[in-house]
UniProtKB/Swiss-Prot annotation:
The keyword Transcription regulation appears for this protein: yes
Organism: Mus musculus
GO cellular component assignments: cytoplasmic vesicle
Organismal lineage: Eukaryota, Metazoa, Chordata, Craniata, Vertebrata
Protein name stated in the entry: COMM domain-containing protein 7
Subcellular localization: Cytoplasmic vesicle
Length: 200
């Protein structure tokens, strides 16, 4: 198997078999399945709808749901990697063919990729920016009163509590900084704020 653009990791052997299964689908079946996959890629939080659509596809095409899920997992390998690495439609097509998908189906998929590229890129960018949104920050100054190192006694430190939003949940992160580290951190935060104001 040639090198893939979407991942450096070794690809499970089952992926090749899944691609062969995809090759056996008719053009309309592959088109319908691709439609389901792109719905999921553009709205990945809709897992239940995705599974319902897969189940419906399996029933209407007399395919077992278990193998179909495996096929979709293998097919998702390329677009997921492509989103992370910003691959072109041509690179997506090449990767699918390298994994064993027929040229006709790989070309069809890459055309769909091209049509949805801007929506997918915006979603991926939004995810990247929203992953660790800082909601609140608290800090307290302290003075070291006892330490095994004599020169550290009397030194000022700072305890930070960051409230970070990860998806729909918030998480508290704690850290302790020396005064020079804190001023360096503050300086970086000011630079980030200035950059954000320039962009808005």
């Amino acid at each position: 198997m040639g090198r893939l653009h979407c991942t450096q990791d070794p690809v499970p052997e089952a992926v090749r078999g899944d691609m062969q299964q995809l090759n056996q689908l008719g053009a309309q079946q592959f088109s319908d399945l691709t439609e389901v996959l792109f719905h999921f890629l553009t709205e990945p939080k809709e897992v239940e709808r995705f599974l319902a659509q897969l189940s419906e596809f399996a029933t209407s095409n007399q395919i077992s749901l278990g193998p179909l899920k495996s096929i979709m997992k293998s097919l998702l390998l390329v677009p997921n990697g492509a989103l992370k690495k910003g691959l072109t439609a041509e690179q997506v097509r090449t990767d699918l063919q390298t994994l064993g998908l027929s040229e006709e189906k790989a070309t069809y998929f890459s055309e769909k990729w091209k049509q949805n590229a801007s929506t997918l890129a915006q979603w991926a960018m939004g995810q990247t920016l929203m992953v660790n949104q800082l909601i609140d920050m608290e800090w307290r100054f302290g003075v070291t009163s006892g330490s095994s190192e004599l020169e550290k006694v009397g030194s000022i430190f700072l305890q930070l509590k960051l409230v970070v939003k990860k998806g729909k949940q918030t998480e508290n992160l704690y850290m302790e900084l020396t005064l020079p580290q804190f001023y360096s951190f503050l300086h970086e935060m000011e630079r980030v704020r200035a950059s954000m104001e320039c962009l808005s």
